[in-house]
Amino acid sequence: MPAISKKKRSKIAEQILSYLYEISPEASFTVKIADEIVRDEEFTKSILEELEKSKLVVKVNKGPEGQDYTKWSRWRMSNAAFEAYKKLH
């Protein structure tokens, strides 16, 4: 499988951020985000982890009732990224 260029990875990251902005302040599971941007779940997770390192998204480790997630990951846009996106839109 050919490597994806940095430019294309950047465009996919923009799609993810756009989706998270639309549903903000809600968090979404990795599988739902992958479905929305029509990408593989593992690939989407790798992009989300890059965005987390850049402090653009935040990983949610607990469910609404306080239970810890062991297998799943939910993601939401960070507050700083949300404010920056809000100024653009």
Give each language-model segment a name:
Residues 1-17:
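Short alpha-helical segments that sit at the start of domains
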Residues 2-3, 36, 65, 89:
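Long, compositionally biased intrinsically disordered regions
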Residues 18-25:
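Short, locally clustered residues in the helix-turn-helix/winged-helix DNA-binding domain
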Residues 25-36:
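Short acidic, hydrophobic short linear motifs in intrinsically disordered regions
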Residues 38-53:
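Short amphipathic alpha-helical interaction segments
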Residues 52-64:
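A short, conserved structural fragment
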Residues 61-73:
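Short, Lys/Arg-rich nucleic-acid/phosphate-binding segment
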Residues 73-89:
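Short, amphipathic alpha-helical interaction segments positioned at domain boundaries
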